[in-house]
Design a protein with these regions (language model features):
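Intrinsically disordered, low-complexity polyampholyte segments enriched for Lys and acidic residues
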Residues: 3-9, 17
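Basic polycationic patches enriched in arginine
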Residues: 4, 21-24
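Intrinsic-disorder-associated, low-complexity terminal segments enriched in Asp/Asn/His/Tyr and depleted
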Residues: 9-10, 25
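Generic low-complexity, intrinsically disordered sequence content enriched
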Residues: 19-20, 185
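HhH-family (HhH-GPD) DNA N-glycosylase catalytic core used in base-excision repair
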Residues: 25-213
């Protein structure tokens, strides 16, 4: 799905971390870094967002919504509808979406600017409520992610992340959680090591780089 299959060919090889050691994750060495730069739809996302850490709650919520909605569809389709998602989901305001009622659900399911799938719409509302709850338990979504980045002293792998997400969130299978975390720097593999975007991201010291294996 998405970055994994849109012009991408994941080989399952391992990424060399900044320290020169091999990560133990089978990560994506894809051609996304070949075709996305300069592409009118993929280019800006590839160059400035994919793999770039952020702590902004609305941005994290947006990324989760987009990754969930991409399931079964192309990433290009989702990027083209991004403005529609922003309008439909109150600018990705967690508090607003968390209070959506049945009338809001019906509005979303009738909106051609987004993906009109009941399970995905319900997941967005539930996940907004889950994120809001994380403010009380951990201080916020970003703090929750940071608190669970390590497992037994090493970088938490995708399988462990999926188990954790499923305790609080809906529609969070392996591919969705993996891409969500990779896109935010919690897992390695968003870019090839020779990609200029990778070189820029390294300077930001994403979580996966802070805890090389």
């Amino acid at each position: 799905a998405g970055k994994r299959q849109e012009g991408a060919n994941y080989t399952g090889t391992c990424l060399l971390t900044a320290s020169g050691r091999r990560a133990r994750y089978p990560v994506a060495m894809s051609t996304y870094c070949d075709f996305a730069p300069g592409h009118p739809v993929h280019g800006p996302y590839h160059d400035h967002e994919y793999g770039v850490p952020t702590r902004d709650e609305s941005a994290l919520f947006e990324r989760l919504i987009l990754e969930i909605n991409q399931a079964g569809l192309s990433w290009e389709t989702i990027l083209k509808k991004r403005d529609g998602f922003q309008r439909a989901y109150s600018g990705f305001d967690v508090d607003a979406v968390a209070t959506y009622d049945d009338a809001e659900r019906m509005r979303l399911l009738a909106d051609p600017g987004i993906i009109r799938n009941r399970l995905k719409v319900d997941a967005a509302i539930h996940n907004a409520q889950a994120i809001r709850a994380l403010r009380d338990s951990h201080g916020g979504f970003a703090d929750w992610l940071d608190a669970h980045a390590l497992l037994d002293g090493t970088l938490r792998d995708r399988a462990a992340w999926v188990k954790l997400f499923k305790k609080s969130f809906r529609f969070t299978g392996g591919e969705i959680v993996g891409e969500f975390l990779m896109s935010l720097g919690y897992l390695p593999g968003a870019h090839r090591v020779d990609c200029p975007a990778h070189q820029r991201i390294v300077k930001l010291k994403p979580v996966w780089m802070q805890h090389p294996l």
